[in-house]
Amino acid sequence: MRILIITGLSGSGKSTAVRALEDEGFFCQDNLPVALFPTFVDLVDNAKERIRDVALVMDIRGRDFNKGFEKVFQEITEAGHLVDILFFDATDEVIIRRFSETRRRHPAIDSGSVPEGIRSERQQLAGLRSFATQIIDTSELNVHQLKDLVISLVKGGEGGREMTVHLQSFGYRFGLPLESDLVMDVRFLPNPYFIPELKEFSGLDPKVRAYVLKHDETGEFLTKFKELLEFLLPGYKREGKSYLTISIGCTGGRHRSVVIAEEIRDFFKRKQLNLKVSHRDMEKG
């Protein structure tokens, strides 16, 4: 049986994720005490009607969530079940805005402000976050994009936990992507931004791509970066990692990082992996 543990900050999109999983045929259980996880899994596993996919929501509403979760996860895994922990996160500013829109009280505090609740919740969830299989930053996602991402994660993990690679470009000016497993800084490469006839185009434009790739340091970097990925990917697969996020950053996220991400896309196409490519800040930079 495949089990997804859905956890993370209040206001980060867990409810949306659960609805997406229900649409994909997952049996979902919300707010179950951690101590009851093994019993619940046994009951579902022995049910007359075979259930293959289960999602359990675990957050601060269950007051004992911080007690013994490591042991509980170990018990479930040793019973032969595939367990992935999806931790949903977002920036404080985005969560504050979402609470303001819904006018809900933050569940981490009985009184006080939403920012205080967020700080408290981050502290309480720090240990659980370290166990996450995948950290999902929903700050820049709308409801439909989040549902699509969750579904791609689920489908990418089917069939023997085949690994899905999310390759994204970004701009340091707009902050690091929280969900990154690997971050590569390409700000040392020649910058088309300072070439007047290239400045207004993105890294998807053939002229910008040709400019970045014609320099010797770009070719040498790509060779070494691909060698690093050749070394790392088998290790991540052996670990059982089902989703790998590689973030490539330049100053504004419009030129160099886009070119390099597209070059690495071609490299991954030959690896028979599930591949998702996005350019987070291309239209901002």
Curated annotation (Swiss-Prot):
Role summary: Displays ATPase and GTPase activities.
Record family assignment: Belongs to the RapZ-like family.
Binding residues annotated for ATP, in chain numbering: G8, L9, S10, G11, S12, G13, K14, S15
Biological classification of the source: Bacteria, Pseudomonadati, Thermodesulfobacteriota, Desulfuromonadia, Geobacterales
InterPro entries noted in UniProt: P-loop_NTPase, RapZ-like, RapZ-like_N, RapZ_C
GO MF terms held by the record: ATP binding; GTP binding
Highest taxon listed in the record's lineage: Bacteria
Binding site for GTP: D59, I60, R61, G62
PANTHER family attached to this UniProt entry: RNASE ADAPTER PROTEIN RAPZ
The name this protein goes by in its record: Nucleotide-binding protein Geob_2284
Keywords of the record: ATP-binding, GTP-binding, Nucleotide-binding
